Amino acid sequence: MALSLVAAACGDDATADDAAGEAAAEGEGSSTAEERCEANRAYGPVTFVTAFDFAAAAGIVELIAADAEGYFEELCIDVEIQPGFAPSNGALVIEGQAEMGMAGSFAEVVNNNVAGEGDLVAVLHWGRTAIEAIVVPEGSEIQNFADLCDSLVGIKGDLPFSLQAAVALSGAERSCFEETLLDGFDPVAHLDLGIDALPVYKSNEPNALDGAGVGYTLLDPLDFDVPASFGVPFASQSFLTENPELAEDVVRALIRGYEFAAADPDAAVAHAFDLIDAAGNPMFFAQETELFRWQTESALIADLAPAGSGVGIPDVALFGAEIDALVDAGVFAEAPAWEPMVNADIASGLYDGTTLIWPGR
């Protein structure tokens, strides 16, 4: 597969002209296709640490698809997919144990940098809203985030950033409701405990509740204009600075992996399960639930993608609004200097209009 790039650079004059045009499209001063291929290969493995094992989630499924479909190989890139969990995967990249990872949101990237004095940079951005929401039992008087005051909210670890922002933007304070830590991941069992509200992922727990016939109301930050994001692949600034063309090609392959996964969800989930099953499925994933996860997330991505823009290009204005909301919520003691933590130029430079530029295609 990698030979396709070499052939494009070393074939007849017409083919060579095509390759030169492709190189020019990728940016003035780019190396030839052959040189770029050899440089990518010479780098060795690029380690990407996932945010939730091998789940079919945005930020993970396109990575798996790109590898399985040979897109990295076509660009002479050796990618090692390491199962991990957010936000600790960010620490591995900060420490230099991996080149890239995926965050649940841009806020998570910023928080990792602030807490760990890191140099993480968001290079793609799939979801332009929160993937989290609040579930309340059917018939509850809680109709908005301000209504959470004086209620009992079940928490798994911590309240997600997007929901902290939603509470703050409603005019309420997080301290106005009681929180109780929950064990396990069964939303049916959690609601049976008598809690008033449960933070969930829109691409996960609602499916389980629907399957069990449990009625509920979903408080979705999207319905309350809460600025948020999900599915945010990142790299270290040092990797981007030292290997700009390799970084471009990794992002290029990820975008093509997303296109494949969006067009063929069943095949994308099947690719994920090749890795899940090979690892012994320690998270007890089921194909039906992972298909629901990816169909839900890809629908949100498609529904909110701006017209006339290439998919995956980071929305810098939205990122700024997301961080401002969290400053107001008290998540950050002071406004962090977030602007260097996103690079939208890499992804935007890989498009001709809304068409991904791919060598030889």
Give, region by region, the residue ranges found by the protein language model:
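Conserved C-terminal helix/tail region of periplasmic/extracytoplasmic solute-binding proteins
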Residues: 317-361
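C-terminal motif of bacterial Sec signal peptides marking the signal peptidase cleavage site
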Residues: 4-9
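Secondary-structure end/capping motifs
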Residues: 243-331
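Short, glycine-/small- and polar/acidic-enriched structural segments
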Residues: 27-183, 187-200, 219-220, 227
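Surface-exposed patches in mature extracellular/periplasmic domains of secreted proteins
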Residues: 81-82, 120-122, 179, 261-272, ...
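Pocket-lining segment of extracytoplasmic ligand-binding domains
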Residues: 140, 185-283
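Bacterial lipoprotein signal-peptidase II cleavage site
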Residues: 10-20
